[in-house]
Every structure is written in C-alpha cells, then in structure tokens.
From Swiss-Prot:
EC number(s) recorded for this UniProt protein: 2.4.2.7
Protein name: Adenine phosphoribosyltransferase
InterPro entries from the UniProt entry: Ade_phspho_trans, PRibTrfase_dom, PRTase-like, UPRTase/APRTase
Any one Gene Ontology BP term: AMP salvage
Gene: apt
Reactions that this protein is recorded to catalyse: AMP + diphosphate = 5-phospho-alpha-D-ribose 1-diphosphate + adenine
HAMAP family: Aden_phosphoribosyltr
Domain of life (superkingdom): Bacteria
Length: 177
C-alpha cells in the first residue's frame, strides 16, 4: 500500500469549503488552494502518479483534471490526453454522453489522432462525486481502444456513491469525506 499521508495532509489543510455553492444544500470543495501551494501541489501529483506508474497515458478530465493530469504525466514521463466537454474540439471526435441530475452531458476526445489503441490509461480528476463524469471518461477512452488501469482523484465524497459506480476500475482517492 502506498503512503499518501503527505498528500492527504495537504488536501485536508488547504481545501476551502463553500457552503450552499453552486446551489443551496451543496457543500463545494474548492481545491484551488491545493493547486496554488507549490508543496501541496507537488505531493498531490506525486501521490496520484504513484497510483499507476505503468500508465502510458493520463486521461485528464475537463477542467481541473487538466491541472492534475499534466503534472502526473510529467512525473511519470507519460502522455496526457485532455478529455473535453462537448463542443471544444474540432471534428472528428469520439464522444460519450452521460446523465446528470437534471439532463445529460457529453465528453469528447480527438478520434484517431491520439493513438490510444492498446495503451494503458490512468484517469485523473479532482473530485469523485456521483461518478458519472469519471465513468463516462473511462468508457470514452476504452472506446478508443485503451485499457483503463485505474482512476485517481484527490477528493471523494463518499455519500454520493461514485465509488460503487466505478466498481469495475481500481480507484484511488487521496481523501474521502
């Protein structure tokens, strides 16, 4: 088992909590202070990278996952693919839609030009809530021929059930609330 205590301490110390944001009854975890603290960011990136040192590619989820994914890819010497929200990439794209609480959303990656076929991918994002975005990301990169070897997040909100939704994939969360 990998010791994530330094990262866990940094996340616990630096995360800013905002009540009733973006709507009443929601408690939002703002990880921006973690990213802006050089030592905090470094230990978080190191801990996420340790989850799958054999990863060929990091799939970084739009938008805060981009910050983490680039750092993890740099640490591992692997590539990084930005998994974008719909409409941000020119065609052709591969897409995966998923259900939100009130509607649907779609994620996209370039079709054919990023060479994911047969490659080992670690999916990285900041927060695991319901698991919809991360599940869609994993299915999207699998549709490109990649093998998802794990999902790694900084913070997991356990009460929202995302871990169960991602049960097929090895999951690492640095902090669970």
């Amino acid at each position: 088992m990998i010791d994530h205590s330094s990262a866990r301490d940094a996340v616990t110390r630096l995360t800013r909590w905002a009540d009733d944001f973006p709507q009443p009854g929601v408690r939002f975890a703002d990880l921006t202070p973690v990213f802006s603290d050089a030592d905090g960011f470094r230990v978080v990136v190191d801990a996420l990278a340790a989850c799958a040192p054999e990863a060929d590619v990091i799939a970084a989820v739009d938008a805060r996952g981009f910050l983490l994914g680039g750092g993890v890819a740099r640490e591992l010497g692997s590539g990084v693919v930005a998994v974008r929200k719909s409409g941000k990439l020119p065609p052709p794209v591969l897409s995966q839609s998923y259900t939100l609480e009130y509607g649907t959303a779609t994620l996209e990656i370039p079709a054919g030009s990023i060479g994911l076929d047969g490659r080992s991918v670690l999916v990285v994002d900041d927060v695991l809530a319901t698991g919809g975005t991360l599940d869609a990301t994993a299915r999207l990169v699998e549709s490109a021929g990649a093998r998802v070897i794990g999902v790694a997040v900084v913070l997991e909100i356990a009460a929202l059930g995302g871990r169960e939704r991602l049960g097929k994939y090895p999951l690492t969360s640095l902090v669970t609330v």
